[in-house]
């Protein structure tokens, strides 16, 4: 069973919209290009005739959400909210597993660390046009990473590595990882963030 969370405010928002649609219309939550860096999540109306036999129906208090078979694993832990602030109201859809399928807790260490980097570290670095890739984990439990994009040549990369990435990964993989080291040659250039 998928664990998509639709907050109360989002359910109320959808219920208002659905009240203006033909009876029996619900919503569909989907991922286009799931499991890729170009993955995008969306929500659309789902009239009764659009429900497919292999869809999963997620029942909520005010509506049902239908998810196609392909999108389902990529929407694990997704959160749909309707937030209002001084700038107005907007629907937010956070799907941490849309670009990469969640790995099992007993998966090999490399896969679990790679998943953590892709879903937790890289989204933070993306704001600066950067990313990090896991190259290997050696016999001493040292994760070797390589920075790319705007991180390459950035003067803050050592701080990012030690205070951000290493700290986060060592807590998450306590007893399995001993350190995180940088393989990247940092040549400053026009692509560098700082």
UniProtKB/Swiss-Prot annotation:
<dbReference type="InterPro" id="IPR035903">
    <property type="entry name" value="HesB-like_dom_sf"/>
</dbReference>
<dbReference type="Pfam" id="PF01106">
    <property type="entry name" value="NifU"/>
</dbReference>
<feature type="binding site">
    <location>
        <position position="154"/>
    </location>
    <ligand>
        <name>[4Fe-4S] cluster</name>
    </ligand>
</feature>
<dbReference type="GO" id="GO:0016226">
    <property type="term" value="P:iron-sulfur cluster assembly"/>
</dbReference>
<dbReference type="InterPro" id="IPR034904">
    <property type="entry name" value="FSCA_dom_sf"/>
</dbReference>
<dbReference type="InterPro" id="IPR000361">
    <property type="entry name" value="FeS_biogenesis"/>
</dbReference>
<keyword id="KW-0408">Iron</keyword>
<dbReference type="GO" id="GO:0005506">
    <property type="term" value="F:iron ion binding"/>
</dbReference>
<dbReference type="GO" id="GO:0051604">
    <property type="term" value="P:protein maturation"/>
</dbReference>
<dbReference type="InterPro" id="IPR017726">
    <property type="entry name" value="Fe/S_biogenesis_protein_NfuA"/>
</dbReference>
<keyword id="KW-0479">Metal-binding</keyword>
<dbReference type="Pfam" id="PF01521">
    <property type="entry name" value="Fe-S_biosyn"/>
</dbReference>
<protein>
    <recommendedName>
        <fullName>Fe/S biogenesis protein NfuA</fullName>
    </recommendedName>
</protein>
<comment type="function">
    <text>Involved in iron-sulfur cluster biogenesis. Binds a 4Fe-4S cluster, can transfer this cluster to apoproteins, and thereby intervenes in the maturation of Fe/S proteins. Could also act as a scaffold/chaperone for damaged Fe/S proteins.</text>
</comment>
<dbReference type="InterPro" id="IPR001075">
    <property type="entry name" value="NIF_FeS_clus_asmbl_NifU_C"/>
</dbReference>
<keyword id="KW-0004">4Fe-4S</keyword>
<keyword id="KW-0411">Iron-sulfur</keyword>
<feature type="binding site">
    <location>
        <position position="151"/>
    </location>
    <ligand>
        <name>[4Fe-4S] cluster</name>
    </ligand>
</feature>
<comment type="similarity">
    <text>Belongs to the NfuA family.</text>
</comment>
<comment type="subunit">
    <text>Homodimer.</text>
</comment>
<dbReference type="GO" id="GO:0051539">
    <property type="term" value="F:4 iron, 4 sulfur cluster binding"/>
</dbReference>
């Amino acid at each position: 069973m998928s664990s998509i969370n639709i907050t109360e405010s989002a359910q109320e928002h959808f219920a208002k919209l659905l009240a203006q649609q033909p009876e029996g219309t619900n919503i569909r939550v989907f991922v286009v290009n799931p499991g890729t860096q170009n993955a995008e999540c969306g929500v659309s109306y789902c009239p009764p005739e659009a429900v497919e036999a292999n869809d999963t129906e997620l029942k909520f208090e005010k509506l049902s959400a239908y998810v196609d078979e392909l999108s389902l694993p990529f929407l694990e832990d997704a959160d749909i909210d309707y937030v209002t602030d001084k700038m107005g109201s907007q629907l937010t859809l956070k799907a941490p597993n849309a670009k990469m399928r969640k790995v099992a807790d007993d998966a090999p260490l490399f896969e679990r660390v790679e998943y953590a980097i892709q879903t937790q570290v890289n989204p933070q670095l993306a704001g600066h046009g950067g990313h990090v890739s896991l190259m290997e984990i050696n016999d001493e439990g040292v994760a070797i990473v390589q920075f790319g994009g705007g991180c390459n040549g950035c003067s803050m990369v050592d701080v990012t590595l030690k205070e951000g990435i290493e700290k986060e990964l060592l807590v998450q993989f306590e007893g399995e990882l001993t350190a995180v080291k940088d393989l990247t040659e940092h040549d400053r250039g026009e692509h560098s963030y700082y």
